[in-house]
């Protein structure tokens, strides 16, 4: 059975309405309770590391996320990171370079509507993210709207559409249809053969 780590950082996916608008108030355990497909296919451990609107993510938070992934890489088959969409592509790209040689899938995902919203895209995005995290494909990826994108090639191009991200100058790593997730092996990053090296210094 696969063992997946869910790292939560806040973002719209974990947000609730407040007097000042949406705020990422939901913790990881509360988020996980709203994911109906967390079944016997894999076990999930949840860890909260941030509760931020992703527009407030700074390099210090990138370092925190990278260190958390690095510290847990040997204990899990894959890691899913929930994140706000505003800076998700930046975080995915930075992690791709900070975690060179990561031997497991690290999959960032989020949503355009909170998970408690009746029309949320969160569950579909999480389903893709967990499928990718169970795939054994090493690297950092973004899973969103039936697509899996190499982390260093993801760009947010649409502010409000569910189809928010595109892959720039690189084929999709994966796509989803009625038959499930299909991975394009030719689009995966090459395996380095050595252990992952954490490059935590950004300047």
Protein language model features and the residues they cover:
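Glycine-rich beta-strand-to-loop/alpha-helix junction loops that act as flexible
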Residues: 9-12, 83-84, 109
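Internal gly/pro-rich beta-alpha loop/helix module
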Residues: 108-178
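Short acidic/histidine-rich motifs immediately flanking catalytic phosphotransfer sites
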Residues: 73-78
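Short Gly/Thr/Asp-enriched flexible loops that form oxyanion-binding sites at enzyme active sites
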Residues: 81-104
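Short glycine/serine/threonine-rich phosphate/pyrophosphate-binding segments
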Residues: 15-16, 87-92, 122-126
